[in-house]
């Protein structure tokens, strides 16, 4: 005598919401955007969902927590965009946001640190305007982020080359050491642009710390 095939587990929409940690309203929105579909309906018209639906909602939640839009998630799930491409593009956006936040942080530090600095209400409009310009540039120019990554890699190579010179005991006036110094100065000038404060800060650090305590850099 053969055994009856057990019926697969089904979830009503409220049960699915409870099982996945989202609201019923959110599930309705997922359905409206084409991300989720009921596996079947009861005779009374109630939506029913299967185990694949539960897994799909968990996948949507995971991608949402990474910051993806529902439109991007749908493209990835439909296969029109590969997940790795989606992750790379999102990484670029995150790096831009980090760069923007770093610039804003430095600006705020300039305004709030130091006993001689006094921040007045009159300065705030100009400060907010500067922040807005930084935000606009970050949002509209991805090449800025790529350039920053490329410069950071160049900086690491210069640092490693200099440390190798020091470990080998090469003379500071040797050809290799001079080439590293030239590369470092060129990169610093490229990063600083017309901002003379960078070279000023390096000179101050040179007076305050010995070269080796500056991770091998001797301005």
Curated annotation (Swiss-Prot):
Source taxon at top rank: Bacteria
Protein name per Swiss-Prot or TrEMBL: Nodulation protein NolA
UniProt KW keywords: DNA-binding, Nitrogen fixation, Nodulation
Organismal lineage: Bacteria, Pseudomonadati, Pseudomonadota, Alphaproteobacteria, Hyphomicrobiales
Record PROSITE patterns: HTH_MERR_1, HTH_MERR_2
Residues covered by the HTH merR-type domain: 10-79
Organism: Bradyrhizobium elkanii
PANTHER family (UniProt xref): HTH-TYPE TRANSCRIPTIONAL ACTIVATOR MTA (PTHR30204:SF90), REDOX-CYCLING DRUG-SENSING TRANSCRIPTIONAL ACTIVATOR SOXR (PTHR30204)
Gene3D superfamilies, alphabetized: 1.10.1660.10
GO molecular function: DNA binding; DNA-binding transcription factor activity
DNA-binding region: 13-32
GO annotation (BP), single: nitrogen fixation
Function: Involved in genotype-specific nodulation of soybeans.
